[in-house]
């Protein structure tokens, strides 16, 4: 059974690379994370991962014309690379190994917390730019261009809740979660995404293009190095994702232990 799931992970990584949803490093990391998750949770864990990556990839294709301006702001656009896969799935990999060694239900919930938070954040990032109005920046309390880190819109917030609930409800059917656990997974997922927005506003590094003056997460814009403006220099988008999903999931894990 394990060999079959690993073969499935290999097929998934190859498909993602073939359709340019993953870079080569992203495909390799997908294979590693998927294999670890299948070792801990079997095919059920892989289905949850597939729902996350699949739904996120599909949403990334929606409204591409509107998202072109976002691509010039965000640090990474297009195919997911290895660091992005690790940022979203690294802790899930650890939770799967911990579950395999202990068979402790709390580690299954930890896995779901991580995926729900990642899915909520990704859905918000993909759905938010479809809004007809620019989002509000938590840092300046003014409207900011779509795709700006630390900015929120109504439709993006709806995407956050829907993304977390999607994973929680799917997990209910796959793992027979109780209603309490469904609510908890959804809540932690939303909390993780909101933390990501907050950290993006106050801590994520920001650059400014020396050619057009646009604020961006990219180190290079219009073929020229960008100028550092604010934020913690080592805190890029991937680091924020790891930090916030880990913090939210850790809080959820503590709640499970004492609730």
What are these regions (language model features)?
Residues 1-259:
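Hydrophobic alpha-helical transmembrane segments
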